[in-house]
């Protein structure tokens, strides 16, 4: 079904069965297959390929040569009807690739809202990405990676399968991430190592001084005080009930399966 207000360039192909919402703009030489739903106000500039099952939300902008919802590159994939779900108001720049999930996981790749994916970023199968994140040029997420809210992944970075990147993290360019990165942490390198708290980012996002100081104390317990992980968690737990941000930090440590960058 194509909404009467949608604008589709005559050189583009929209297969029968696709659902195209109000005020959607599909520029020249795009392809949208029959198992795709595109929400209100979303724009495909030109030469965009969207395969399905894929659901794209409202007011996204997808630039030329992006490949959205293609089959994943996992060798176990055997053509199952897995999905890609994208939220609202994302900017997806040139040559970005986002793949559908696999049945070995939950079968869904999920991208939240208000994210920026710069040129040539890659989101592999079964990734789960939060809101208001930035992925710089050539940032690469392997399968099953989870990224929290308002994280920044630097250009040319690569994140190993199953790694978790916490809320408000900042990864420097060229980083190779093979373990989980706790919330609020700045890290860089090969292999990626922590070098502080994303203080400037936290200030911009409205964290008050007391909360930031509490996060710093949690960071020092984990990285600067010479404690084992279990001892650090016990020390951090003393402030977890008073400060929600510290509780988030502690919960992340408790749930980590790949281990924490140290």
Swiss-Prot record:
<comment type="similarity">
    <text>Belongs to the transferase hexapeptide repeat family. LpxA subfamily.</text>
</comment>
<comment type="subunit">
    <text>Homotrimer.</text>
</comment>
<dbReference type="InterPro" id="IPR037157">
    <property type="entry name" value="Acetyltransf_C_sf"/>
</dbReference>
<dbReference type="GO" id="GO:0009245">
    <property type="term" value="P:lipid A biosynthetic process"/>
</dbReference>
<keyword id="KW-0443">Lipid metabolism</keyword>
<keyword id="KW-0963">Cytoplasm</keyword>
<keyword id="KW-0012">Acyltransferase</keyword>
<dbReference type="Pfam" id="PF13720">
    <property type="entry name" value="Acetyltransf_11"/>
</dbReference>
<keyword id="KW-0444">Lipid biosynthesis</keyword>
<comment type="function">
    <text>Involved in the biosynthesis of lipid A, a phosphorylated glycolipid that anchors the lipopolysaccharide to the outer membrane of the cell.</text>
</comment>
<dbReference type="InterPro" id="IPR001451">
    <property type="entry name" value="Hexapep"/>
</dbReference>
<dbReference type="InterPro" id="IPR010137">
    <property type="entry name" value="Lipid_A_LpxA"/>
</dbReference>
<comment type="pathway">
    <text>Glycolipid biosynthesis; lipid IV(A) biosynthesis; lipid IV(A) from (3R)-3-hydroxytetradecanoyl-[acyl-carrier-protein] and UDP-N-acetyl-alpha-D-glucosamine: step 1/6.</text>
</comment>
<dbReference type="GO" id="GO:0008780">
    <property type="term" value="F:acyl-[acyl-carrier-protein]-UDP-N-acetylglucosamine O-acyltransferase activity"/>
</dbReference>
<keyword id="KW-0441">Lipid A biosynthesis</keyword>
<dbReference type="InterPro" id="IPR011004">
    <property type="entry name" value="Trimer_LpxA-like_sf"/>
</dbReference>
<keyword id="KW-0677">Repeat</keyword>
<dbReference type="GO" id="GO:0016020">
    <property type="term" value="C:membrane"/>
</dbReference>
<dbReference type="Pfam" id="PF00132">
    <property type="entry name" value="Hexapep"/>
</dbReference>
<dbReference type="GO" id="GO:0005737">
    <property type="term" value="C:cytoplasm"/>
</dbReference>
<dbReference type="InterPro" id="IPR018357">
    <property type="entry name" value="Hexapep_transf_CS"/>
</dbReference>
<protein>
    <recommendedName>
        <fullName>Acyl-[acyl-carrier-protein]--UDP-N-acetylglucosamine O-acyltransferase</fullName>
        <ecNumber>2.3.1.129</ecNumber>
    </recommendedName>
</protein>
<keyword id="KW-0808">Transferase</keyword>
<dbReference type="InterPro" id="IPR029098">
    <property type="entry name" value="Acetyltransf_C"/>
</dbReference>
């Amino acid at each position: 079904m194509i909404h009467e207000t949608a604008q589709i360039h005559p050189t583009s192909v929209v297969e029968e069965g696709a659902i195209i919402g109000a005020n959607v703009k599909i520029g020249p030489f795009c392809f949208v297959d029959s198992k795709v739903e595109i929400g209100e106000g979303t724009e495909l500039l030109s030469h965009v390929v969207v395969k399905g099952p894929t659901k794209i939300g409202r007011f996204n902008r997808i630039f030329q040569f992006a490949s959205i919802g293609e089959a994943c590159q996992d060798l176990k994939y055997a053509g199952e009807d897995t999905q890609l779900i994208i939220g609202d108001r994302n900017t997806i720049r040139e040559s970005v690739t986002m793949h559908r999930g696999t049945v070995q996981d939950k079968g869904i790749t999920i991208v939240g809202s208000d994210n920026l994916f710069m040129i040539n970023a890659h989101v592999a199968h079964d990734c789960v990405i939060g809101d208001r994140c930035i992925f710089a040029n050539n940032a690469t997420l392997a399968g099953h990676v989870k990224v929290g809210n308002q994280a920044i992944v630097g250009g040319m970075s690569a994140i190993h399968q199953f790694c978790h990147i916490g809320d408000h993290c900042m990864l420097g360019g060229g980083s190779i991430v093979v373990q989980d990165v706790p919330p609020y942490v700045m890290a860089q390198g090969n292999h990626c190592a922590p070098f502080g708290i994303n203080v400037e980012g936290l200030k911009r996002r409205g964290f008050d001084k007391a909360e930031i100081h509490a996060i710093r104390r949690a960071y020092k317990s984990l990285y600067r005080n010479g404690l084992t992980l279990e001892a650090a968690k016990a020390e951090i737990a003393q402030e977890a009930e008073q400060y929600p941000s510290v509780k988030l930090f502690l919960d992340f440590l408790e749930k980590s399966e790949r281990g924490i960058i140290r």
